[in-house]
Amino acid sequence: MTPRTPALVAALAAMALGTAHAQTCTEPHYRWSEKVDTSFATQPPAAVDVSDMLTWMPRTITATDKCARRIGRERNVYAVTAFVRRIKLHEADGDWHVEITEEEYTPAPASCIIVEIPAPAYGNIYRQARDQLAGLVDTTHLAANGDLDAPVEVTFTGAAFFDGYHQKQSSTGKHASQHGRCNSSLSALWELHPIYDVTAPVGP
């Protein structure tokens, strides 16, 4: 055995583990187990503003990281109070896709983030969260594109999630793409997903 053999064996083992992990990734959608995870629901939330989230450092993961686990900030729960601007109720993965902004009438593409509520099939807590949102926003009278007639202020509580699926590489560098209207920066790919609780905001 040469002096380099142990290092070579370790490198080959690491490659094998990585390959095995890639081969066993059977998620039906991007990072699906993380998106429907209820294990953080009892964690006390930290208050955060949309403007704060738009400064968070993006993760490096992309669409190829279909089974990436939660790390760092993604293991924390936050409560954000913001104005609901658009709700899409019929996404392919069954989530309720909600676009929110910190201010009532700021242009959404320049200032929005997304929060998402999974289908009730993944936990009764999501049925409750959808019922809570429907009690604050009339989800039966949305525009064809999901827009509200007038923004409604709501507090959403959920786990932070970086949607690296929409982090794209081009000749000019990395950028956000096709993340609803919320593509102002890579930091706009931060979401609260899943949402565990939806309430009316507490007064000043």
Spans of features found by a protein language model:
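OB-fold and OB-like single-stranded nucleic-acid-recognition modules
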Residues: 23-204
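Hydrophobic helical h-region of N-terminal Sec-dependent signal peptides
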Residues: 8-13, 17
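Sec/Tat signal peptide C-region and signal peptidase I cleavage site
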Residues: 18-22
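Bacterial N-terminal signal peptides that target proteins for export
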Residues: 1-9
